[in-house]
């Protein structure tokens, strides 16, 4: 290359000619002989020669300044490059190379006036894999779209001894605007609602125009974020840590990702699989912030298996990374853990869109479970990475919504309650809650009550945590069917006991968890906002706090909703303060605090030591929440000496255990008479006699009772009838015995 020739010119021309169809350059181009002595430089690109004519000319001066000129001929354009005073090197190039939108697009992205010094400086700006990272890896596993869970209706199967309710679908009229889908094809493919100009203005890449969608997760400010860009053939993970040029991870089928001279794709391939490549574009000056790129095991958990198996990908990759991020308290940080999690999330979206390539039929329950799993990891990404309030654009899945609509209004499409939970979850997360009927939420609330009863005297199973995770999200993402949502909310609150919190901290000590739901506790979605390390230390002053307790409280802080705005009578509660909110019935709520916090009818607790206070405020579910720090209407707490189960007057109530000096210890929800009997049965040791411990019952009618010394009167009509039936059966058996003996 002659001195003074911009480096882009030759390479760019080679690129253009290799991408343009072979054609004549001028009327007599086909008859011209190729004389090598007639050209200053001859390049041959795949049989298509580029000819640079040798010609020296002089240029007249004008106003004592030199100018180079471009001579336009019929079939060529000449470029004049200064060599010495009054002497230029002139290169003639075919005009067709510079005509049309493709040429214009590329010419607008290169600087033909770039100096050699700037060119050399740019060569040393970006990190090369072979030179600066030295961590290239290839994976040879076979890639095939499939689902390792087969037709399994739930990711975590239920215990064999748990009876799963069947869905009862009432007679109903199909909505007039219903257009349900009858296919699962393209079910997990999000709607590409944008046309993107990718890599526009990037130093290394030519821009490309393609259908795409963007998702941004902004942390503390505009300069700290992770962005996901998904296209048909590849995805891009953009990571910015206060940088003017963010790091790019580009993965997929990449023939449309084109590099500017002098760089080549091979310089930036960090990982390679059977079908896809991973490119990393990062400046050398930023390697100290992204030092994990040099780790030989970076992204192994995402790529070292058949990642086109969506279920395996979610379990082995995303959930593995997400569990690590959550347990280590790395949400709202940008390091190796969160970058790997973001990559696994993008890979899950990429793989999910290709599930129809498996070519196998998929059942409706399995399809709903997979789609709910995709929306659930999106929800976690927003919870973990986005600032408050979140600004992330939600991905839309129109085919999944159509399928859910069909299943909801067509008999026998879904049979188990677990599928209904996922169907409702999908509609709620796709802003379609107006399509959710009341009967669906009613059955989900009944399922929550079943889990409540199943685990009154036992720890939550992995299956129960999975289902409560989904239901807890429903509670805080919908505005309709408030009665049913209030019931689910109080169930989650009642399950958030000290025993659950203790068991949860023990779970965190285990090194392996397959799914995020394994780390879910009802405390995350409940009305209990009074758990803190300081409070636990006060409750157990002589106990050594396990190392997992801070991690457990960090998880609670991360996973708890940032607002209670879906409940009109609770939305104003300041979530930074300590309180417990109890939606015991359709119309009555209680807020338990150590100071006046919300307007309503308050019941100050008098049996606490000096310096400690406990205030129970009753509110009406239809009354708008109003924050107040002043004393207002108060009622006294009545001591109850006995409780009658007649007419279930004590159903839908909360049993509150508190200590004279430490305040609230436990809260238990009692939905029906069986729960009341269980709580007050001395053999269950729920109510334990102690000089410092007291028990209050918060009733559905707005009354608060002291029940520390209560005696249960179980002689209600229902129990009497059961006794009569039992006595009659005994007498009948005895008479039958006498008759047989006589014979």
From Swiss-Prot:
One Pfam match: Herpes_glycoH_C
Signal peptide: 1-23
Main subcellular localisation: virion
Keyword DNA damage carried by entry: no
Glycan attachment residues as annotated in the record: 56, 63, 68, 193, 642, 701
Keywords: Fusion of virus membrane with host cell membrane, Fusion of virus membrane with host membrane, Glycoprotein, Host cell membrane, Host endosome, Host membrane, Host-virus interaction, Membrane, Sialic acid, Signal, Transmembrane, Transmembrane helix, Viral attachment to host cell, Viral attachment to host entry receptor, Viral envelope protein, Viral penetration into host cytoplasm, Virion, Virus entry into host cell
Bridged cysteine pairs (disulfide): none
Subcellular location: Virion membrane; Host cell membrane; Host endosome membrane
PTM text: N-glycosylated, O-glycosylated, and sialylated.
GO BP annotation list: entry receptor-mediated virion attachment to host cell; fusion of virus membrane with host plasma membrane; symbiont entry into host cell
Gene3D superfamilies: Herpesvirus glycoprotein H, C-terminal domain (2.60.40.3190)
Family: Belongs to the herpesviridae glycoprotein H family.
Subunit structure: Interacts with glycoprotein L (gL); this interaction is necessary for the correct processing and cell surface expression of gH. The heterodimer gH/gL seems to interact with gB trimers during fusion. Forms the envelope pentamer complex (PC) composed of gH, gL, UL128, UL130, and UL131A. The pentamer interacts with host NRP2. Forms the envelope trimer complex composed of gH, gL, and gO. The trimer interacts with host PDGFRA. The trimer also interacts with host EPHA2. Interacts with UL116.
Name of the protein in its database record: Envelope glycoprotein H
